Amino acid sequence: MAQVSMRDMINAGVHFGHQTRYWNPQMKPFIFGARNGVHIINLEKTLPLFNEALAELTRIASNNGKVLFVGTKRAASEAVQAAALDCQQYYVNHRWLGGMLTNWKTVRQSIKRLKDLETQSQDGTFDKLTKKEALMRSREMEKLELSLGGIKDMGGLPDALFVIGADHEHIAVKEANNLGIPVFAIVDTNSTPAGVDFVIPGNDDATRAIQLYVSAAAAAVKEGRGNEAQVAEELAADAE
């Protein structure tokens, strides 16, 4: 079972919140105290919440659910992409485009355009164009890849969002809320837990903390996908 320990979280600095003057009073239940003007998150609260979230991610993945990892902060970008690819899921790590979920029809058209351009770049179409036209299409493809590359094979709306920094990704959280998609999010002391179904109180800036969150989430998803494969094997065996 994918789980994290208290030691894992302490070593990663999950307990370091933001400066006290930036706090959101809604996070008071999850704050242990303050040290040198910085709020300290109560990891006794975070630990069970994090492990409950991981168990639910495993359950969603075991039902063939799609998980979208979201983290567009510079500190989160690479880790989010790597974790999503590791568990064969999806990611947005550059910029959240408004309507990415709530206007999926339009997004789907942009994804189709991206795939068309990828095909053109590989089948020699670009070579037949003028240098200027080829460059323009190449730039368009790169721009679309940056925004949509992590969701181009998602094939529809996700079944869950795993978000690094609820405050920073508030548009993604709101869109998921509007569509009834469960939100799992790291919520720091300066953020609001409103709209987050699975609140994980923790530092949302430290690279080591972010690495812990996304690798644990990826492990939970992989475990769920493993269960899914095991069930499929058992059903196939029963059918024989």
Curated annotation (Swiss-Prot):
Gene name for this UniProt entry: rpsB
Species whose genome carries this gene: Haemophilus influenzae (strain ATCC 51907 / DSM 11121 / KW20 / Rd)
Record-given protein name: Small ribosomal subunit protein uS2
GO molecular-function term, one example from the UniProt record: structural constituent of ribosome
Family classification: Belongs to the universal ribosomal protein uS2 family.
HAMAP family: Ribosomal_uS2_B
GO CC annotation terms, alphabetical: cytosolic small ribosomal subunit
GO terms under biological process: translation
Alphabetical UniProt keywords: Ribonucleoprotein, Ribosomal protein
UniProt keyword annotation of Magnesium present: no
Source superkingdom: Bacteria
